[in-house]
């Protein structure tokens, strides 16, 4: 229904009555993104676009520099992002009045956070840490002890936090404290599930981190610009500013970009080689069949102005198309979920750490969904399912002492010698 603005005189009570908007209605500030109005016609939106573009340029530049620095620096970047996300989410349900009566309660949240960090990264990177110190006997034994007792150490850290929480319980504050305890654990699950898969992708080869992350960025930028200049039709009520024009335009752009970026990234060993230790040196490896070009001859009807009748395609580019399809169709639902979450708590953004973009969590909503899919896809369709020599050696180095490894070496030599004499 549409109320006539002239139906009541300004001086009458009826003229002062304000109609209450329904919860599922499109807010007036975003109506111009739909119907017959375009955001491009709203001059006030250009300032917001410029701020957003300026922040994006700085983020992309910093991201490119960290990629150049290598695996460890990318991991450090992920840790920093985790800390920002946790801070934003911890603050979401905080109430200043209750916190004043609970000194040290915030510190307890961070105790659980760093305990979770030690557990997740300790399990994920223990083998690479062992590979890094193999040549130093003292460090090798020290790291071996850490790996052996890692789980029990993390358990006692957690139990210490659990006891700390119980001892801080105060009368009339139980409900608030238990809600914060549950909220903290939910945050840890969300943040560390995403980051664990992200870090695993990094050490499998920067390619498997960089391509999915880049596709989300491209999809986000393309959706913004297609929606800004052409958006008319609302896509979903949870995000009234999202339009079908932006969604479709971004999907096409993302899928094409996936095919082209895979070809570009796949030609650099720095991006394709997995990192087996925690060093920062240059990588040199056999890229494998996925990153070796295959040549295709274009048909005769292809336009004559094309530079060559033969094109080189990396097999990984076909996999990239599926990643691009997921990034453009499925991953945006992570953003829709975040939009619904923010509406539930009546907030515009999770934070304000990135001008024009909101908080770090606002930038990571789709990335979380994409990182998990990229890891599962890589493990299911890219990594060989049979045991490799490297995997067997990793298990020997990780689980056996130096004396046991020496015994395996002698026994293996004996078996090979017996087989050699038997064949002769």
Swiss-Prot record:
Tissues with expression? Roots and sink leaves.
Q: Which cofactor does it need?
A: Mg(2+)
Membrane spanning residue stretches: 60-80, 102-122, 149-169, 183-203, 206-226, 246-266, 321-341, 369-389
Give the UniProt keywords, A-Z.
Answer: Lipid biosynthesis, Lipid metabolism, Magnesium, Membrane, Nucleotidyltransferase, Phospholipid biosynthesis, Phospholipid metabolism, Transferase, Transmembrane, Transmembrane helix
Enzyme class, first EC level, given as a word? transferase
Stretch list, region Disordered: 1-29
Cellular localization per UniProt: Membrane
Gene Ontology MF annotations: phosphatidate cytidylyltransferase activity
Taxonomy, superkingdom: Eukaryota
According to UniProt, the reaction catalysed is: a 1,2-diacyl-sn-glycero-3-phosphate + CTP + H(+) = a CDP-1,2-diacyl-sn-glycerol + diphosphate
Membrane-related topology note: Multi-pass membrane protein
* Pathway it works in: Phospholipid metabolism; CDP-diacylglycerol biosynthesis; CDP-diacylglycerol from sn-glycerol 3-phosphate: step 3/3
Which processes are annotated in GO (biological process)? Answer: CDP-diacylglycerol biosynthetic process
**EC number from the UniProt entry:** 2.7.7.41
Q: How is the cofactor bound?
A: Requires a divalent cation for activity.
Q: Which PANTHER family match?
A: PHOSPHATIDATE CYTIDYLYLTRANSFERASE, PHOSPHATIDATE CYTIDYLYLTRANSFERASE 1
The text of the family note is: Belongs to the CDS family.
Q: What is this protein called?
A: Phosphatidate cytidylyltransferase 1
């Amino acid at each position: 229904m549409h109320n006539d603005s002239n139906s009541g005189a300004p001086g009458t009570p009826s003229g002062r009555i304000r109609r209450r908007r329904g919860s599922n209605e499109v807010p007036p500030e975003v109506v111009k993104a739909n119907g017959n109005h375009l955001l491009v016609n709203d001059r006030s939106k250009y300032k917001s676009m410029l701020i957003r573009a300026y922040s994006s340029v700085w983020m992309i530049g910093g991201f490119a520099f960290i990629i150049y620095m290598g695996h460890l620096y990318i991991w450090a970047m992920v840790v920093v992002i985790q800390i920002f996300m946790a801070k934003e989410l911890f603050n979401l349900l905080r109430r200043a009045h209750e916190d004043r009566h609970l000194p040290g309660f915030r510190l307890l949240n961070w105790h659980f956070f760093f305990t979770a960090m030690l557990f997740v990264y300790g399990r994920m990177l223990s083998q690479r840490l062992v590979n890094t110190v193999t040549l130093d006997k003292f460090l090798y034994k020290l790291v071996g002890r850490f790996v052996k007792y890692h789980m029990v150490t993390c358990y006692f850290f957690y139990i210490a936090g659990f006891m700390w929480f119980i001892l801080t319980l105060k009368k009339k504050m139980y409900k608030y404290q238990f809600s914060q305890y549950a909220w903290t654990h939910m945050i840890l699950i969300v943040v560390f599930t995403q980051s664990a898969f992200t870090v695993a992708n990094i050490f499998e080869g920067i390619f498997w981190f960089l391509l999915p992350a880049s596709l989300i960025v491209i999809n986000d930028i393309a959706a913004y610009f297609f929606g800004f200049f052409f958006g008319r039709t609302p896509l979903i009520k949870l995000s009234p500013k999202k339009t079908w024009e932006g969604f479709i335009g971004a999907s096409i752009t993302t899928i094409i970009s996936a095919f082209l970026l895979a070809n570009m990234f796949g030609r650099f060993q720095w991006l394709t080689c997995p990192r087996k230790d925690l060093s920062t040196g240059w990588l040199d490896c056999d890229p494998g069949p996925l990153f070796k070009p295959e040549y295709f001859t274009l048909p005769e009807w292809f336009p004559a102005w094309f530079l060559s009748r033969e094109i080189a395609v990396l097999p990984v580019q076909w996999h990239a198309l599926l990643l691009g399809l997921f990034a453009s169709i499925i991953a945006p639902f992570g953003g829709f979920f975040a939009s619904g979450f923010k509406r539930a708590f009546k907030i515009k953004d999770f934070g304000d750490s990135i001008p024009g973009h909101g908080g770090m969590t606002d930038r990571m909503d789709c990335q979380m969904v994409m990182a998990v899919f990229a890891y599962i896809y890589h493990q299911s369709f890219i990594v060989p399912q049979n045991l490799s020599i490297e995997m067997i050696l990793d298990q020997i180095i990780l689980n056996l002492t130096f004396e046991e490894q020496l015994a395996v070496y002698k026994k293996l030599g004996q078996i090979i010698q017996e087989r050699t004499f038997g064949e002769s």
